[in-house]
Amino acid sequence: MKTPKNDVYTVSRLNGEVRQLLEGQLGRIWLNAEISNFAAPGSGHWYLTLKDNFSQIRCAMFKGRNQAVTFRPANGQQVLVKGNISVYEPRGDYQLLIESMLPAGDGLLAQQYEALKMKLAAEGLFASDTKRSLPANIQRIGVVTSPTGAAIRDILHVLARRDASIEVIIYPTPVQGTDAAKSICDAINLANSRREVDVLLVTRGGGSLEDLWSFNDEGLAHTLYNSGIPVVSAVGHEVDMTISDYVADLRAPTPSAGAELLSKDADNKAQKLLSQLSRLKQSWQHYQLKKQNQLQACEHRLQKQDPQRRLQMYEQSFDEMQLRLQQAMQTKLHAYTLKQQNLSSRLASQSPQHRLDLEAQRLSYLSAKLNGAMIDKLKMSEQRLAHRAQQLDTVSPLATLSRGYSITLTGEGKVVQSPSDTCVGDTLTTRLRDGSVTSTVVEVG
């Protein structure tokens, strides 16, 4: 069979191309997993395996990176790591080169927020050219919020002060909790189906990242994007930026600011300026996000060409050989220890003292057995004697007397069996159960 020379790979070439393919396609990723096989050799690098219930992947975190970790990793610990997929060419294994590590849960929401923001930005949901202008003459405002929260009270207060003619329709919904995001989507869809308002104000008061998390939902982002009614997002405080703020047609820093944005007053120019500033801020944020993505892509390409990676690979190979040598030495030492224990056991089994101990145990056993046999024999004899005594007692005259019978004896002690055994004038003794009676024969019949 002929093989074209151009199609024949060497192992090194194959591993090199696999490395370029994996590193070029996947880039930087986040991974949530459990640590196992953690090792920290003298080089300062860390080697570990990250796993879940079904799979595992080898990982390396070099000294320059792990010095920034604020805790000591341990086997069984759940962590969140960021890194790049790479191929360790000498062994043909693919691995994750870890750049940063956090305990699982710490920063996880922030990481999910950033990941979703990048995804939706790539899908075009934040694009400025998709934003709609607000109606020039707003008569009805639909407010999507909790009917009992502070946000709706602030909104109604601002509208009453600035323009009491504006009608407010509340689409009540929970703004916090497990099902809040779905409820908010349902309220927006309801408003779109009724077509009774000019603009929607999706809002709630301030809170922690967890409290505002319903407004970082991917489903809600698409619902806002697909809304046929212009949407203003006013979630939290000035410093809070949620996914809904990026997707909405306009963002207000607070619920009160949202109400001011949608109502007219004497200073209409200020309202327009606020709108323009909000759009400018969104455009600047989109520009920053785009440049951040470009910077990360450049950093990734630079890492692939960095000679430091080659040095790290050699250091990793050295560390692995050192670990294998330590394991081999421990295995050999364990084998010698077992052999020594086996020889000691065999020597102890051949010792005369051991045989003497065995014979002493045997003698003690036989003595105990003999004593037991003698005791059993004595018990059997006692039982036989008791049985014989019972039999004798059964035929004893005394036993007969106890049943109400009597025995009559002559003066010489002979048993009287017939009247002919007596004469008139003889003295007789009659034995009873509990005594005797003496009588004199006066007549023989």
UniProtKB/Swiss-Prot annotation:
<comment type="subunit">
    <text>Heterooligomer composed of large and small subunits.</text>
</comment>
<keyword id="KW-0963">Cytoplasm</keyword>
<dbReference type="GO" id="GO:0003676">
    <property type="term" value="F:nucleic acid binding"/>
</dbReference>
<protein>
    <recommendedName>
        <fullName>Exodeoxyribonuclease 7 large subunit</fullName>
        <ecNumber>3.1.11.6</ecNumber>
    </recommendedName>
</protein>
<comment type="similarity">
    <text>Belongs to the XseA family.</text>
</comment>
<keyword id="KW-0269">Exonuclease</keyword>
<dbReference type="InterPro" id="IPR025824">
    <property type="entry name" value="OB-fold_nuc-bd_dom"/>
</dbReference>
<comment type="function">
    <text>Bidirectionally degrades single-stranded DNA into large acid-insoluble oligonucleotides, which are then degraded further into small acid-soluble oligonucleotides.</text>
</comment>
<dbReference type="Pfam" id="PF02601">
    <property type="entry name" value="Exonuc_VII_L"/>
</dbReference>
<dbReference type="GO" id="GO:0006308">
    <property type="term" value="P:DNA catabolic process"/>
</dbReference>
<dbReference type="InterPro" id="IPR020579">
    <property type="entry name" value="Exonuc_VII_lsu_C"/>
</dbReference>
<dbReference type="InterPro" id="IPR003753">
    <property type="entry name" value="Exonuc_VII_L"/>
</dbReference>
<dbReference type="GO" id="GO:0008855">
    <property type="term" value="F:exodeoxyribonuclease VII activity"/>
</dbReference>
<dbReference type="Pfam" id="PF13742">
    <property type="entry name" value="tRNA_anti_2"/>
</dbReference>
<dbReference type="GO" id="GO:0005737">
    <property type="term" value="C:cytoplasm"/>
</dbReference>
<dbReference type="GO" id="GO:0009318">
    <property type="term" value="C:exodeoxyribonuclease VII complex"/>
</dbReference>
<keyword id="KW-0540">Nuclease</keyword>
<keyword id="KW-0378">Hydrolase</keyword>
